Design a protein with these regions (language model features):
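Alpha-helical transmembrane segments of multi-pass small-molecule/ion transporters
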Residues: 1-254, 258-329
């Protein structure tokens, strides 16, 4: 297994602050409003990784086969698989805030996805790499999950426990967590910027000299992003999920945990690899795509019930169920 120490430090700087925000205690309440979580889990773990792999094979082995070097096609597919195999963790809170999402529910969604990611990321990536006839380096995959998910998550959980202290402190623990995350957030931004600069330093010549290749890589990424969003968003609309849950629910699957994808791509294939290039293009594509989807979600807010309307409907259904049939007549 190969680990780039500089990249590892930068990834930790990016990931650790967001892991402090993860609250596993919130998972105790998932049974209260399960619809958004059901959609999130199904789309993120049973649909998204497989559609991304399928799009990669479709475009790079068939539709774009005459436009790219066949020797590089496998690496591009691998990069797409890595991007599609894990939902976003950090930027979800930004997208949720921009769509006026339920911050507490978003936290529950992120916490649940992080738990699943610890156990599901490596097997899903190994399965999809194997199906596409790529070598499955289990040692590096498992090491990457431990380094870039388990260790930051454990450190974040321990930090949160120290900050919150004992229960019943009147919310002071939550305030301490908020102050701490605000204080370390600049390190996360610096880590992100340094990682992007590092990647652009190694991949900049391709980005500047081969715009056609960049456009070809962007095509399946764009189709995947918009397709996954509208799948989750439509499911939430059909199930009458309130907008402050539906919008973050759809955006979580649309966005990728690109920090993990970057780290694993570099560990498996190297800084100069086609897989690493795909993760760089993923970063370039993601922000404008997500902003366009945030704008769409805000414009369609009135198509969804509000949280208050859902609670009223649920209360009405409960009351109706409690009234004997003779009384309803």
């Amino acid at each position: 297994a190969s680990v780039n120490l500089v990249v590892a430090v930068l990834i930790w700087a990016m990931v650790y602050p967001m892991m402090v925000a993860v609250d596993f205690a919130s998972l105790r309440h998932i049974h209260r409003r399960p619809k958004g979580l059901v959609i999130t889990v199904i789309v993120n773990w049973l649909v998204k990784p497989f559609t991304m792999a399928a799009l990669g094979v479709l475009f790079f082995e068939f539709l774009f086969a005459d436009l790219i070097d066949p020797a590089d096609a496998g690496q591009y597919i691998a990069g797409l698989i890595l991007l599609g195999a894990a939902p976003c963790t950090a930027m979800v809170f930004v997208w949720s805030q921009l769509t006026r999402g339920d911050a507490n529910y978003t936290l529950v969604q992120v916490s649940l996805n992080d738990v699943i990611m610890v156990f599901a990321f490596a097997p899903i990536v190994a399965l999809l790499l194997g199906v596409t006839d790529l070598e499955v380096p289990w040692e590096t995959l498992l090491l990457s999950v431990v380094l870039y998910v388990v260790i930051p998550l454990a450190a974040g959980t321990a930090t949160r426990a120290l900050l919150t202290g004992k229960a019943g402190d009147g919310g002071r623990g939550a305030a301490r967590v908020a102050r701490f995350t605000a204080g370390v957030k600049p390190f996360s931004i610096l880590g992100l910027l340094a990682t992007v600069v590092l990647l652009f330093g190694f991949q900049g010549h391709v980005l500047l000299n081969d715009p056609l290749l960049i456009a070809l890589i962007a095509v399946p990424l764009l189709i995947q992003s918009y397709g996954i969003f509208f799948l989750a968003y439509a499911a939430a609309w059909a199930w009458r999920v309130p907008h402050n849950v539906a919008a973050p629910c759809a955006l979580i699957g649309t966005s990728n945990f690109f920090e993990l994808a970057v780290a694993v791509a570099i560990g498996l294939f190297g800084l100069n690899s086609g897989a690493a290039l795909v993760t760089v293009v993923g970063v370039l594509v993601e922000v404008p795509v997500m902003l366009s989807l945030v704008a769409f979600a805000n414009r369609t807010r009135n198509r969804f019930p509000t949280a208050a309307e859902n609670e009223t409907a649920a209360s009405g259904d409960t009351a109706a169920a409690l009234v004997p049939e003779e009384g309803r007549r």
